[in-house]
């Protein structure tokens, strides 16, 4: 039994476990205390002071930071006294004194935690006029822009980057000159940044944001010479709805497809189809390596953030990486080869757009070593869920009112195995569903067989019997957990045959391109689990749940590739990797 502490908050008696903070105690009785720097279990530093409350422990009232101040027996707390209100308002005014206040043109306007608090506390813009250092925009990275003129020094991005074991950003200088930058004052694109975008989704303001590629898409849609096709990743269908007021994890596939068609795309396709294609290639690759005992463990290659992490920090594992392109890359490849041939089109006239929950996909789209057609990129523009939402709103489409629509052929039919790619463990489970039937020759009837790889835990392990042979697998999400697994493999402590790694904690549902959830919600709701529920529900409701049973995938092999792992498939659907320096 936990020792309990009794206190009063705003006159209400509260009993909470010893070690709880005032913030947590207040939350337990329905009192929300505002924060800016606080991220539960990740950035508990009490730096912003927005969470100040008055606490009396028998020595008179004192203003304390509730996010780090522990409760004590008999404590009396006021969360909304006149002194507290004044202190919070003054703190906000001081933050604004050095803040770039171009709110109307800021990408986070309407979804800015600082803006929201300033509105709630009636803060006026020009109470204090502080010295404002002026910073140049850092546009050096392929996926994002850093605008330190809007930074409030909350260090949430630093915590997110450290959590990923990348740690390429931190506090530089002191006093008024303090800024969040890169080691040695390098530009972000000159560091070992892996483009995951976790810093973006954890930033409370507009200091970090994805590079906006929507103008490229608008121009392509307006070009009569271009055939513009779009693919949507699995996690998009459970994220996009949040931008239009739906509950977290709501499946909005039909409305998403309808909106894309209204935007003018010539073909609206499902990346889940390409995920099924990936499984066909990856399962074949795994069985080939497993039977030969070569380059094991096989490690998945669907997450470009993980791939870049491996290239920068663990190049010794490059031989273990699957040579399969990611589903985004595979779709682009088949669009500019098989689809072009089938439709009688010149590949250079096809403009492929990806809607992804991931900022690292922008980096992947720029990789010249991934092209299926010489001189042409597989992907012409990769946009985030947030960018798509802005396009839909800009076009005046009433997302909630439009009728549902279906994906187009020949890349519109997909299995539930492709759907669960968006959740951590999904790629592994999808591959095992196919590998099981290929190896045993038996029908997989119980889909709970591989449930051990589900869930948001950072590292999951399982051993499965495939026709009398044991296969040891591991799943890691978040690069801190990937590091743990890789170090155990290096030391010989663990031996696995197959490893799935996703750069973002929880997988693509928690990607750097997903809708940004304010810390006031994400501190108390498991965003990863809520969005993943939608994907597993979608999988359960689909009539087709195994990649190798997808008739559209079978048609691609029958008409074009021959068989999984063929020479043609390797040329178009597979790739290589490059060792990179850290700085």
Q: Which positions does each model-derived feature cover?
A:
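Fe-S ferredoxin-like electron-transfer domains
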Residues: 49-195, 208-223, 227
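Residue-level recognition of oxygen-bearing side chains
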Residues: 21, 156, 198
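Canonical Radical SAM [4Fe-4S] cluster-binding loop centered on the CxxxCxxC motif
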Residues: 195-202
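Iron-sulfur-associated redox domains of electron-transfer enzymes in respiratory
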Residues: 2-6, 13-84, 211-583
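Cysteine-centered loop/knuckle micro-motif
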Residues: 161, 203, 252
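Structural motif corresponding to the C-terminal cap of alpha-helices
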Residues: 165, 203, 339-343
């Amino acid at each position: 039994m936990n020792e309990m502490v009794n206190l009063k908050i705003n006159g209400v008696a509260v009993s909470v476990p010893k070690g709880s903070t005032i913030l947590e105690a207040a939350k337990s009785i329905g009192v929300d205390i505002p924060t800016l720097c606080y991220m539960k279990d990740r950035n508990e530093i009490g730096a912003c002071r927005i969470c100040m409350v008055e606490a009396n422990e028998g020595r008179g009232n004192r203003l304390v930071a509730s996010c780090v101040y522990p409760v004590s027996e008999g404590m009396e707390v006021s969360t909304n006294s006149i002194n507290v209100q004044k202190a919070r308002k003054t703190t906000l005014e001081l933050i604004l004194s050095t803040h770039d206040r171009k709110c109307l043109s800021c990408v986070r306007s309407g979804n800015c935690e600082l803006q929201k608090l300033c509105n709630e506390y009636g803060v006026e813009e020009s109470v204090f006029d502080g010295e404002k250092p002026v910073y140049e925009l850092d546009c050096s990275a392929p996926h994002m822009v850093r605008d330190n003129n809007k930074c409030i020094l909350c260090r949430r991005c630093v915590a997110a980057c450290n959590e990923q074991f990348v740690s390429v950003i931190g506090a530089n200088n002191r006093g008024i000159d303090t800024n969040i930058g890169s080691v040695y004052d390098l530009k972000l694109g000159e560091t070992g940044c892996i483009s995951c975008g976790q810093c973006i989704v954890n930033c409370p303001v507009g200091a970090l944001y994805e590079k906006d590629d929507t103008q490229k898409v608008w121009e392509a849609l307006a070009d009569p010479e271009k055939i513009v096709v779009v693919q949507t990743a699995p996690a998009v269908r459970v994220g996009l709805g949040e931008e239009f007021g739906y509950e977290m994890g709501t499946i909005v596939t039909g409305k998403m497809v309808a909106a894309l068609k209204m935007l003018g795309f010539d073909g609206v396709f499902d990346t889940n189809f390409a995920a099924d294609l990936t499984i066909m290639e990856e399962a074949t690759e795994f069985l080939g390596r497993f039977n030969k005992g070569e380059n094991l463990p096989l490690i998945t290659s669907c997450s470009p953030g993980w791939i870049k992490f491996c290239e920068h920090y663990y190049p010794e594992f490059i031989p273990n990486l699957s040579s399969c392109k990611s589903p985004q890359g595979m779709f682009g490849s088949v669009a500019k080869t098989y689809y072009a041939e089938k439709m009688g089109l010149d590949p250079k006239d096809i403009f492929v757009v990806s809607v992804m929950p991931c900022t690292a996909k922008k980096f992947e789209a720029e990789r010249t070593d991934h092209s299926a057609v010489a001189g042409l990129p597989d992907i012409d523009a990769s946009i985030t869920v947030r960018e798509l939402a802005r396009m839909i709103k800009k076009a005046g489409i009433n997302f909630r009112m439009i009728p549902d629509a279906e994906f187009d052929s020949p890349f519109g039919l997909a299995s539930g195995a492709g759907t669960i790619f968006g959740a951590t463990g999904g790629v592994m489970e999808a591959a095992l569903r196919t590998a099981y039937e290929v190896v045993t020759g038996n029908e997989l009837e119980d889909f709970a067989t591989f449930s051990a790889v589900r869930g948001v835990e950072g590292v999951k392990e399982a051993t499965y019997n495939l026709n009398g042979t044991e296969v040891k697998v591991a799943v890691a999400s978040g690069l801190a957990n990937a590091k743990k697994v890789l170090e155990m493999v290096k030391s010989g402590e663990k031996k696995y045959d197959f490893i799935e790694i996703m750069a973002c904690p929880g997988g693509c549902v928690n990607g750097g391109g997903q809708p940004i959830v304010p810390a006031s919600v994400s501190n108390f709701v498991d965003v990863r689990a809520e969005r993943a529920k939608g994907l597993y529900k979608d999988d359960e409701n689909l009539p087709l749940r195994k990649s190798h049973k997808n008739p559209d995938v079978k048609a691609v092999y029958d008409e074009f590739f021959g068989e999984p792992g063929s020479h043609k498939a390797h040329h178009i659907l597979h790739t290589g990797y490059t060792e990179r320096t850290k700085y």
